[in-house]
UniProtKB/Swiss-Prot annotation:
Keyword Nucleotide-binding: no
Gene3D superfamilies associated with the record: 3.30.60.20
Name recorded for this polypeptide: Differentially expressed in FDCP 8 homolog
Stretches assigned to coiled coil: none
Length: 447
C-alpha cells in the first residue's frame, strides 16, 4: 500500500514526456497537490532551455533521454524547416563548446539542412542519357564523390542531387542546370579542328571583347566591377570568374617555342580542350621550330629511336612470330610512332622533358632488336652483308654503326660507305644490268 502511494505521488510530480495532454494541462493549470517549485525542476546552470512552440516540429533537442532518432523530423514544408534550422543554430551556440550535446545538435542541424535541400530539389526520375549542344550527358550514380557544377559553380551534393557528366569533354553539372548550358561540347572542336594556337598568349585587349566574357558574354572589368576579368594564357582572351577558375595547364605554344613546361592559368573551356588534345599528334616540329633539335638533346635521341623503329616495322609485318606476339602493340598508346617520325603530341614532349619517354622507348627498341637479331631466324635471314668489306657479320639498317643507301636500301658499314665516297656497289650493279637489258634484248633476259 505504501508503494502505491509513493508511485501515485511520483506520477503527479513528474510529467510523462510522451503524453502531450499532460504538457497542455501543465501549461494552463497546475496538478492538484503540486506546488510550483515541485512541478518543474530547474535546470542546472550552463544548460540552455530549448522551448519549441506547439505548432513547430519536435527536433529532439529538448529532451535528452527520449530524443527522436537522428533524421526523423516532423517538418513538412520549407518554412518549418528553415525555422527549425534557426532554432537549432541557437541551441548549438548556447551549448558548451565541444560537448556531446553540442555535437548531437550539429548532427541534427546537418540532417535538417539535407531535408531542406531535398524539398527544394526533389529527386525526380531523370533520364540516363541527355544530348544537348553535342554534349552527351550520362547520369552519374556516385553519391560520395564531391564535384563542382561547371555551370553554376556550386558544389554538387551527389547524395541528394541528380547530376550529369559529358562523356566527350567531362563537363559536369546539375540536372537543373542542363537547360542553361550555352557552350557546345569541346569534343566536336577537337574532332573537326584538331590544331593548337601556336602564338604565345595572343592578347587582343579587353576592348575588343566589348568588356564582356569571351565565353558567356557577362560584363567584366579589370577593376573587379562588376566581375573580375581573368586572362587565359592559351587564348589570350579574358573571362569571368564563372568561366575561368584559375586552372593550370601546359601551354603548347610555350613548349614548341621556348621548351617551357610551366603550367599557366587557363579558362575552363581551354583546359578541357588542352586535355582532349594532349595525346593527339598534331605538332610537326621540323616545320614549327626546326632549331629545337639543336638545343634539346633528348629530342634528338627520341627522333633516332623512332627512325629505327620505322626501319624495324617491315621485319615485323612479314614475320609470323612477330605478328602472333603482337610486338607492335607495345606502342599502341603512341600509334603515330609506327607511322612516321615527324609528328609529336604535347604528351610526347612532356614525357621527353621528364625523361619517361626516352626510357620506355629505349626498352621497346631493345625488345624489337632482340627479336630481329637473336630470337627469330627468319628475321635474321633478312639481314645484310657489307659488300664493300665482305666481312661476315650480319648488318641491319637500324644498327648504329651502319649506313643505308637511299636508292636501293642496301646496308653497309658506315666507315666503308664513306671511305668509298658513298658509292653503292649494288646500285652500280643494277644500273649495269639495266643497260645490258636495253642493249641485248632477248628471251633470256633474266640470265
Amino acid at each position: 500500500m505504501e508503494y502505491d502511494e509513493k508511485l501515485a505521488r511520483f506520477r503527479q510530480v513528474h510529467l510523462n514526456p510522451f503524453n502531450k495532454q499532460q504538457h497542455e494541462q501543465g501549461a494552463g493549470e497546475e496538478a492538484p497537490g503540486i506546488t510550483s517549485q515541485a512541478r518543474l525542476p530547474e535546470l542546472p546552470p550552463g544548460e540552455p532551455e530549448f522551448r519549441c512552440p506547439e505548432r513547430v516540429m519536435d527536433l529532439g533537442l529538448s529532451e535528452d533521454h527520449f530524443a527522436r532518432p537522428v533524421g526523423l523530423f516532423l517538418a513538412s514544408d520549407v518554412q518549418q524547416l528553415r525555422q527549425a534550422i534557426q532554432e537549432c543554430k541557437q541551441v548549438i551556440l548556447d551549448l558548451p563548446e565541444h560537448s556531446e550535446k553540442q555535437k548531437d545538435a550539429v548532427v541534427r542541424l546537418i540532417h535538417l539542412r539535407l531535408k531542406l535541400q531535398e524539398l527544394k530539389d526533389p529527386n525526380e526520375d531523370e533520364p540516363n542519357i541527355r544530348v544537348l549542344l553535342e554534349h552527351r550527358f550520362y547520369k552519374e550514380k556516385s553519391k560520395s564523390v564531391k564535384q563542382t557544377c561547371d555551370k553554376c559553380n556550386t558544389v554538387i551534393w551527389g547524395l541528394i542531387q541528380t547530376w550529369y557528366t559529358c562523356t566527350g569533354c567531362y563537363y559536369r553539372c546539375h540536372s537543373k542546370c542542363l537547360n542553361l548550358i550555352s557552350k557546345p561540347c569541346v569534343r566536336s572542336k577537337v574532332s573537326h579542328q584538331a590544331e593548337y594556337e601556336l602564338n604565345i598568349c595572343p592578347e587582343a585587349g579587353l576592348d575588343s571583347q566589348d568588356y564582356r566574357c569571351a565565353e558567356c558574354r557577362a560584363p567584366i572589368s579589370l577593376r573587379g566591377v562588376p566581375s573580375e576579368a581573368r586572362q587565359c594564357d592559351y587564348t589570350g582572351q579574358y573571362y569571368c570568374s564563372h568561366c575561368h577558375w584559375n586552372d593550370l595547364a601546359v601551354i603548347p605554344a610555350r613548349v614548341v617555342h621556348n621548351w617551357d613546361f610551366e603550367p599557366r592559368k587557363v579558362s575552363r573551356g581551354s583546359m578541357r580542350y588542352l586535355a582532349l588534345m594532349m595525346s593527339r599528334p598534331v605538332l610537326r616540329l621540323r616545320e614549327i621550330n626546326p632549331l629545337l633539335f639543336n638545343y634539346v638533346e633528348e629530342l634528338v635521341e627520341i627522333r633516332k629511336l623512332r627512325q629505327d623503329i620505322l626501319l624495324m616495322k617491315p621485319y615485323f609485318i612479314t614475320c609470323r612470330e612477330a605478328m602472333a606476339a603482337r610486338l607492335l602493340l607495345q606502342l599502341q598508346d603512341r600509334q603515330h610512332f609506327v607511322e612516321n617520325d615527324e609528328m609529336y603530341s604535347v604528351q610526347d614532349l612532356l614525357d621527353t622533358h621528364t625523361g619517361r619517354l626516352g626510357c620506355s622507348l629505349a626498352e621497346t627498341h631493345t625488345l624489337f632488336a632482340k627479336h630481329i637479331k637473336l630470337d627469330c631466324e627468319r628475321c635474321q635471314a633478312k639481314g645484310f652483308v657489307c659488300e664493300l668489306c665482305r666481312e661476315g657479320d650480319v648488318l641491319f639498317p637500324f644498327d648504329s654503326h651502319t649506313s643505308v643507301c637511299a636508292d636501293c636500301s642496301a646496308v653497309f658499314h658506315r666507315d666503308c660507305y664513306y671511305d668509298n665516297s658513298t658509292t653503292c656497289p649494288r646500285c652500280a650493279r643494277l644500273t649495269l644490268r639495266k643497260q645490258s637489258l636495253f642493249r641485248e634484248p632477248g628471251p633470256d633476259l633474266d640470265a
